[in-house]
Swiss-Prot record:
Annotated region described as Disordered, given as residue ranges: 1-22
Superkingdom field: Bacteria
Span of the annotated motif JAMM motif: 229-242
Signal peptide: none
GO molecular function, one term: metallopeptidase activity
Name listed for the protein in its UniProt record: UPF0758 protein Atu1607
Bridged cysteine pairs (disulfide): none
Keywords: Hydrolase, Metal-binding, Metalloprotease, Protease, Zinc
Limits of the MPN domain: 158-280
Native species: Agrobacterium fabrum (strain C58 / ATCC 33970)
Length: 280
């Protein structure tokens, strides 16, 4: 049997990086794929531009931070808008990012600086750039503020520190998203014994149990009460149910020598006093 003539072999050494195949350089097919080089040079250029832009952005917001700190140092909080104070706080919480957009987004979402600090954790985390750690730190600031205000009425005659009572209650309750019923228990000198939340309900109602309130007052040897609850709607005007509930508590407490000094309703931008409205 005649042997087939040997075909000339192509040098396909591993160093070439290619293998012969159908439609390749070796059978005269389209050569564009072979001569197309990886676009490494343009990519390198793009990366260099991006890095430069990032450095410029970093220099800009670091300079902005310095300027904002200087304004605060020289002029105090009056020199800054709400979003700028929040931005200044976020510098510490988010050290390597431009925090102005986050601060503005928080104010846009919740309306005021106080509302930002009073917002629930899950809602804070819905804002882009605010993770759990940042949200917790914002709530920590709110807690510190409330403790500071509460210290202004501790061990003092509450009726003689009325503006401090209102400031504390507003900080603690104005931005709650559900109704909350709080009681300040006072001794016979009207000094604060205890500050307790007795109930928390829905957006427009919270259950109140007059007998439980009186029982707790007796346990604490309290002889006077200040009732406080919030209206998440923002309007502190007393409802008919608020008036009737207050009367029931007064009627339950009075035979046991416990006085209800006032019932305060806290709204977002103000408060209503039953005593001031001559409802008690």
């Amino acid at each position: 049997m005649a042997k087939r003539p040997a075909l000339p072999s192509a040098d396909l050494s591993p160093t070439s990086g290619f293998e012969a195949g159908e439609g390749d350089l070796f059978n005269g097919a389209d050569e564009r794929g072979f001569f197309a080089e990886p676009r490494s040079a343009p990519k390198k250029a793009a990366r260099a531009v991006t890095a430069t832009e990032q450095e410029a952005d970093a220099a800009h917001y670091h300079g902005h931070r310095d300027r904002l700190r200087t304004r605060y140092r020289d002029g105090g909080d009056a020199a800054l808008a709400d979003y700028e104070l929040l931005e200044l706080l976020l510098f510490r919480l988010i050290p390597r990012r431009d925090t102005k957009p986050i601060a503005k987004a928080l104010i846009a979402r919740f309306g005021t600086l106080g509302s930002v600090l009073g917002a629930p954790l899950p809602l804070l985390q819905e804002v882009k750039g605010v993770g759990e750690a940042v949200a917790l730190d914002l709530k920590l600031v709110a807690s510190v503020s409330q403790r500071m205000l509460k210290s202004e009425i501790r061990n003092k005659q509450v009726l003689g520190s009325w503006s401090s009572v209102i400031d504390y209650c507003h900080a603690a309750m104005a931005h709650e998203t559900r109704e909350q019923f709080r009681i300040l228990f006072l001794d016979k000198r009207n000094v604060l014994i205890a500050d307790e939340v007795q109930g928390q309900g829905t957006v427009d109602h919270t259950p109140v149990y007059p007998r439980e309130i009186v029982r707790r007052a007796l346990e604490l040897s309290s002889t006077a009460l200040i009732l406080i609850h919030n209206h998440p709607s923002g309007d502190p005007t007393p409802s008919r149910a608020d008036i009737e509930m207050t009367k029931t508590i007064i009627d339950t407490a009075k035979p046991l020598g416990i006085t209800v000094h006032d019932h305060i309703i806290i709204g977002k931008d103000g408060h209503a006093s039953f005593k001031g409205l001559r409802l008690i």
